[in-house]
Amino acid sequence: MRKTASRVSVYPYDLANGRLSPMVPAGICVAGRWRVAQFYVDSGAFYTLMHATHAVDCGLDFKKGRKSYAQVGDGSLIPVFLHRLPMQIGGKRFEATVGFSEKLGIRFNLLGRQDVFQHFKICFHERRKVVTFQTVECC
């Protein structure tokens, strides 16, 4: 079996709603257009979620995605429309399930576990205020 070297990307925490938080830049290809967006790394979130305006800005009819519901912090459910999209974090490119919602009530995107965390060993270092993504062989 051939092994490939893993890559490590280190991201300093950035502000999210006035607090230093584990934020990472990720490339996402929406309707054939690559853009970079900031994501809050949320190990408690199943799906990666973005506000619907990101899809609309790229010309994607997000409501053509598979409709599902995501539970948010106050316990309520919001509708999300799921799409399989190319993403890139550091040098690792992969396909991920991304949900778009008009009801996402936070000002930042969420990077969830589904289709994302399997590609990385992710370490939160609270004292240093950094999050590291180390690529791993998967699937």
What residue ranges belong to the model's regions?
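Pepsin/retropepsin-fold aspartyl endopeptidases
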Residues: 1-139
